[in-house]
């Protein structure tokens, strides 16, 4: 019988999500990878236990996480039932809908029919009465924004979600969505977007600035750029790397000599700071207080502990930030 560590709240700081009442741990656990049916279940349990024992209260899922789609929610539901159910009121569980989930015209994008049906399915797979956050997973160019936001409002009013979130939106669409949700009195509190030293899209498309101005939180996924911002690729591509074993999310063509040189230069900056490259990459995201939480993935429990160590130093000098920009190709005169 699992008993959570009595010291679990002594490790991590918790950040307020925008101006809401919701607090997120500075580091959250994402179940995008390593929780599908191709992964070892006992290892999944260890990952979740290690996370919670060290103050990671937030577990982030989506309907399509796997492989196969739905399997991450199903496996998390089993972990919840066997280990975490007594701690439900200490957990922040999120899921999403927006990508292809089932065949036909009603299993994708942002219609009211799809989002509300998907949420019901997600709750059933996880064995939950509600999720804490329900996200629309991506912008839908063909469905009226009012319909999609109305579905999020219905999810909250029905008690099946406590808060609404948006994922992969840009600044302009976020602002429009926020106005609709405010008018509907829906607690929209958070944006989830890809963000790393190598991917600064949210700085370029206005999302980061808009979220801060509107007092909404941000949680960053892929903070290590699918493993590029670790020591895994300092000497080229390892045979057991994700590139070799699962090329869906990180293509071998991305790892050029130029990219390897950037990784090595960033690693030297990290070493000078007394950090690993991964620690520095996570700290960089949290450097200015504008990102509420950083979403990590893990295949081993030790990786969770290593990532938490990034919080030991999230302060950067102007020279360090300039060096990181130069090394990663983002420096502007």
Residue ranges and their predicted role:
Residues 35-40, 64-72, 140-144, 171-172, ...:
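Acidic-and-aromatic substrate-binding clefts and catalytic sites of carbohydrate-active enzymes
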Residues 38-51, 110-126, 174-178:
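Short, acidic/polar
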Residues 123-143:
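Active-site groove signature of glycoside hydrolases
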């Amino acid at each position: 019988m699992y008993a959570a560590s009595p010291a679990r709240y002594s490790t991590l700081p918790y950040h307020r999500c925008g101006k809401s009442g919701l607090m997120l741990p500075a580091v959250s656990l994402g179940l995008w990878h390593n929780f599908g049916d191709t992964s070892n279940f006992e290892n999944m349990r260890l990952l979740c236990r290690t996370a919670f024992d060290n103050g990671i209260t937030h577990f982030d899922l989506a309907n399509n996480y796997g492989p196969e789609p739905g399997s991450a929610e199903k496996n998390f539901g089993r972990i919840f039932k066997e280990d975490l159910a007594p701690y439900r009121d200490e957990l922040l569980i999120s899921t999403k809908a927006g990508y292809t989930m089932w065949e036909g015209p009603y299993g994708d994008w942002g219609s009211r029919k799809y989002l509300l049906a998907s949420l019901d399915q997600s709750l059933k797979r996880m064995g939950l009465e509600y999720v804490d956050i329900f996200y629309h997973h991506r912008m839908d160019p063909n469905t009226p924004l009012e319909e999609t936001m109305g579905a999020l409002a219905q999810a909250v009013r029905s008690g099946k979600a406590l808060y609404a979130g948006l994922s992969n939106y840009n600044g302009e669409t976020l602002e429009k969505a926020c106005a609709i949700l405010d008018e509907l009195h829906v607690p929209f509190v958070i944006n989830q977007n890809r963000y790393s030293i190598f991917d600064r899209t949210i700085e370029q498309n206005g999302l980061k600035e808009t979220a801060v101005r509107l007092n909404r939180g941000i949680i960053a996924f892929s903070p290590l750029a699918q493993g590029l911002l670790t020591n895994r690729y300092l000497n080229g591509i390892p045979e057991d790397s994700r590139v070799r074993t699962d090329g869906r999310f990180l293509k071998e063509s991305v790892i050029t000599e130029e990219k390897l040189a950037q990784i090595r230069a960033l690693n030297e900056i990290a070493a000078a700071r007394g950090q690993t490259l991964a620690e520095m990459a996570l700290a960089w995201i949290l450097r200015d207080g504008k990102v509420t939480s950083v979403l990590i993935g893990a295949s081993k429990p030790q990786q969770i502990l290593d990532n938490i160590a990034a919080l030991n130093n999230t302060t950067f000098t102007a020279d360090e930030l300039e060096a990181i920009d130069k090394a990663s190709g983002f420096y502007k005169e």
